[in-house]
Amino acid sequence: MDIAVIGSNMVDLITYTNQMPKEGETLEAPAFKIGCGGKGANQAVAAAKLNSKVLMLTKVGDDIFADNTIRNLESWGINTTYVEKVPCTSSGVAPIFVNANSSNSILIIKGANKFLSPEDIDRAAEDLKKCQLIVLQLEVQLETVYHAIEFGKKHGIEVLLNPAPALRELDMSYACKCDFFVPNETELEILTGMPVDTYDHIRAAARSLVDKGLNNIIVTMGEKGALWMTRDQEVHVPAFRVNAVDTSGAGDAFIGCFAHYYVQSGDVEAAMKKAVLFAAFSVTGKGTQSSYPSIEQFNEYLSLNE
C-alpha cells in the first residue's frame, strides 16, 4: 500500500442556490445532487484515481447509504477491509450549499464516523505498517487522530494532518509530530486567531505555527494557490485560473493529489504544483469525488497546462 486514509466518509447532500433563505423564509433552489463524500473518503478517492494504492479506515452506518459508500470506494480500487458498519447508527451526512459564486458552506453530521476508534487502528496495524503515508482529518474523534499520529511516529510512517473542520481544542503538540499540516485559510484563522484576509497575513499566521514547532505547513488558499512553509524556507505555488462551477471538495482534491505525488517522488514543491492543478480541474465540475479527474484525464490536463 502507498497511502492509508484514516478518517471520515459522508453522504453529500448538495443544494445549488442563488441565495440562502432567511429565518422563516422558503425559497426554491435550482438544483440538488447526492454524492459520496466526507473529507477522508474524498482524499482517498482523489489519490486512488491517480493510481495510488489506498487503504481506508472508516465507519459507515446501518442504513441505505452504507453499501453504496462501500461500493463507491471499491470501484476506485480502495482497500475496504477496515470499512465497517456500525449497527443502529446512521451514516455521516453533509448538507452542502453552493451559492451563485460557486462557493460552498457545509454542515456535517458525523454519524457512524464518531465510532472510529484507536482500537480500529491497532486492529489494522499490520496493513498500516506497509503504508508510506497516513492521511488524517478531524471529522472523527480526536483521540483516534492522536493515536494514528503516534502510530505513524512509532513505525516510521509519515503523517499528513488536514485540520478540517478546524477545532480550537486540537492539541498542537500532536500537530507538531506530523510531517505535514495542511489547513485552508479559514482553518488557519480559527487555529491561530490571526487575520488571513491578505497574503501577508496568511504568511504571518502560518509562521506563528511554524514557530510553535510545526515541521511543514501547507496552506491551501483557493484562487491564491498554496503556501508551503518550514523553519528554513517558504514557497508559494500560484493558482491556475479556471471558471469555477463548484468548489466543494477542492481542498480534499489537493490533499489526495499531493499525497499521491509526494509518495511517488518525495518532492514537496513538485507535488504541490500538481495538486494545485488537480484542485483547479475539480472546481470546473459539480460535486466532490465526481469532479476529480482520472489519471488519464489529469495527464492530459497537465500536458496542456504545466
From Swiss-Prot:
E.C. code: 2.7.1.229
The UniProt record gives the binding positions of K(+) as 246, 248, 282, 285, 287, 291
Site description Important for substrate specificity, residues in chain: 10
Q: Does the keyword RNA-binding apply?
A: no
Name the cofactor(s) required for activity, per the record. Answer: Mg(2+)
Q: Which residues bind substrate?
A: 10-12, 38-42, 139, 252
**Other noteworthy facts:** Located in the deoQKPX locus, involved in 2-deoxy-D-ribose utilization. This locus is absent in E.coli K12.
Q: What is this protein called?
A: Deoxyribokinase
| Higher taxonomy | Bacteria, Pseudomonadati, Pseudomonadota, Gammaproteobacteria, Enterobacterales
Q: Which gene encodes it?
A: deoK
